[in-house]
A protein has these predicted regions:
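ABC ATPase "signature
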Residues: 169-170, 178
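Conserved ABC ATPase "signature" region
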Residues: 14-15, 51, 55-58, 62-79
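Conserved ABC ATPase signature
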Residues: 23, 84-88, 92
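ABC ATPase NBD coupling module
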Residues: 16-32, 56, 61-62, 175-179
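A short, surface-exposed alpha-helical micro-motif characterized by mixed small hydrophobic
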Residues: 151-153
Length: 262
């Protein structure tokens, strides 16, 4: 909506900063937007809110209905088509916002903190809907969020920004597995907390590390990370047999990102 003071905004190979106002208006129609606080018109029903962009574009009423009803069905609100926003839950309001954003057949869908105002259960339902839209419509979705669990569940790639500067980017699995920037590490702190050895256990382990084992060998503390198919392979068992080792597992967890275990 606002032109940047410097740099470029390139969408689908086109630099938006070099377009005229008329060209920019046309290009905006190919970009849908989901807002954090829904931004629905209280005087319009579910149908009316979804139909609004099409009415503003001058589409005939019969064509609008042909377009709107399948979208309302897609987001699971067929039974609420004539209800007003005041009669809907937060999750239902967000679904209206999603349907409205899809009404203009966008190539890209921007989701600006779309789940931050929702409860955990509704958040999960909304994320599943967005994944469904991504797969069924082949639509690119750009998620703007500070919730790393949202990134983990729905995104393929991630870009981490700090004070307007990109500090890290890459495949979600790789960034979660090995974050390079301290900002990313801090953001992932909560998500990775379950993988951190408790402080009390660390002190006990330090004592063991300074004490030779029964075979006279020095004890070591090692963190192993398995990604993808390697999570199901008996790596520790093979190492024990091959190198005549004893081992004790202090902490372990299996997580999943985009159907990939790690």
């Amino acid at each position: 909506l606002n032109r940047p003071t410097s740099g470029s905004v390139i969408v689908d190979g086109k630099d938006l900063t070099k377009m005229s106002e008329s060209e920019l208006r046309e290009e905006r129609r190919s970009i849908g937007m989901i807002f954090q606080h829904f931004n629905l018109l209280s005087s319009r029903t579910v149908y009316g809110n979804v139909a609004l962009p099409l009415e503003l574009a001058g589409m005939p009423k019969d064509k609008i209905r042909e377009k709107v009803m399948p979208l309302i069905e897609l987001v699971g609100l067929s039974e609420h088509v004539n209800k007003y926003p005041s009669q809907l839950s937060g999750g239902q309001k967000q679904r209206v916002g999603i349907a409205r954003a899809l009404s203009s057949d966008p190539k890209i869908l921007l989701s600006d903190e779309a789940t931050s105002a929702l409860d955990p259960e509704t958040t999960q339902a909304t994320l599943q809907l967005l994944k469904k839209i991504n797969k069924e419509l082949g639509l690119t979705i750009v998620m703007i969020t500070h919730e790393m669990d949202v990134v983990k569940q729905i995104c393929n790639r991630v870009v981490v920004m700090n004070k307007g500067v990109v500090v890290e980017e890459g495949d979600v699995l790789e960034v979660f597995r090995d974050p390079k920037n301290e900002v990313t590490q801090a953001m992932l702190g909560t998500a990775l907390a379950a993988r951190t050895i408790p402080a009390s256990m660390v002190e006990r382990v330090k004592k063991v590390l300074n004490t030779p084992g029964e075979n006279g060998r020095k004890n070591h503390l090692i963190r192993l990370t398995f990604v993808g198919s390697s999570t199901t392979e008996p790596v520790l068992s093979r190492a024990c047999s091959k190198f005549d080792l004893d081992f004790n597992i202090l902490l372990g967890q299996v997580d999943e990102i985009q159907s990939e275990s790690y």
